[in-house]
Amino acid sequence: MDRVSNLPDGVRGHILSFLPAKHIALTSVLSKSWLNLWKLIPILDIDDSEFLHPEEGKAERLEIRQSFVDFVDRVLALQDDSPIDRFSLKCITGIHPDHVNRWICNVLQRGVSDLDLFIDFSYEDTQEDEDMLPQEMFVSKTLVKLKIRNDRCVDWWCGKGGTSLPMLKSLYIDSDLILWGKMKRFLSSFPVLEELRMASMEWKESHETVSSASLRKLSILGTGCEDYVNPKSISFDTPSLLYLNYSDLVAEDYPLVNMGKLLEARINLIVKDDQIKRVREPNNDLLQDDAGNVVLQFGNVVKLMNGIQNIQILYLTADTLEVLSLCCESMPVFNNLKTLGIKSEEGRGWQAVPALLRNCPHLEYLIIEGLLHNVTDKCGDACDCISREDKGRSLASCPVKKVEIQGFRGTMREINMIGHFLRSFKCLKEMGIFPEEEGPTNFENPGAFEYVEKILKLYNEISNCDVYFLVWGYMRRKWTTQ
């Protein structure tokens, strides 16, 4: 410790900034020089879980809460008005909102640029359903990065003049409900915003527009409108966007999709089981235009795909594949796409996979998470689930060079599909197979690994492809072309 004590104050303050506030406090007993370092620490990380124990009785909880409040007050008092760069506060065990908001205002007044809040105002003496954060936070001139996590409802203060965070570049919100009004007006409060992540999000209106000229990275993990209802329309006017992670109930329309610079997209268009059933009904294109006609409602998803057709990397979930089955004939051509990832589920079909593969003329890398999927009469020629004359035609025309199969369970159906891929992908040079690590597999049976290895070795002899089989991070076997 003597060597550390002899370091310059600035160096010691920098070292302490990597520790939680409670651990920093322990150093203050070493000497007066360590006590004075509080003012030099530009980063504070405060976590009430290090103080509070929910299993204690009510009286004990109240006493410990007060000691936590006293500790935070003391820490902020020691720092006085010294500048602070980052303030992280995890406070989820019922601290009164007056205390929390006072701490937030303290660091705002000192010019904090990075604010990370994980809070819950479920105080025993408070009956409010909404968590009211201090108004000063919504008009800060110094905030560059803001992260809010909350299990309840957060009321986003707009005020008479509206929210104004002119320096904010990164915003992350994870809450069951955020009261903010129209999305377009909400985003106009952040003129230089570059990164936005919204989790557990519910749209306030049935017609919404995500509009930002500066946004480069966008993640929306939504739950549709109130009561889990599909939005009527969602528009994206984000001309500078490079990355999109969009997970939400599929909207009935996508009138505007302005994403000309987009490079990577992860799309999860969530559909309910009853909607899937109606999508698969025979002659569904003859159905009348009514509220229950999901074919007409979701057919406009092709507008979303048209808007992202310049991307280089695309990941699609099993639900998304089902929705895309409605627009196979109008699927855009993805001329720049190099990497395609698809996720399969046994209750969802592959009807859209052949159209996707045909419309990716420069595809190099295909990732398939799970081979097992729902077999239908529209399953297409990408798999060998149904005997057909044109089986494998979409694969033969696909230029993919590398295929990665994740979540392999060792079933005969999967083994047959792997053989189908090796025979049909004419340009394939490499295939990696990764077993399922969480769910049940056939590998629990004696001799299963050896049997799979034997079959894969036979497949390898009929292909011009290197095949490797990895088990829990270790190379189980690799066969190379001769």
From Swiss-Prot:
Keywords: Leucine-rich repeat, Repeat. LRR repeats lie at residues 122-150, 175-200, 222-248, 313-344, 345-370. Coiled coil: none annotated. Gene3D superfamilies: Ribonuclease Inhibitor (3.80.10.10). Residues 1-47 form the F-box domain. It comes from the Eukaryota. The keyword Zinc does not apply. SUPFAM superfamilies: F-box domain (SSF81383), RNI-like (SSF52047). SMART domains: FBD. It holds the Pfam family LRR_At5g56370. This is F-box/LRR-repeat protein At3g58930. It comes from Arabidopsis thaliana (Mouse-ear cress).
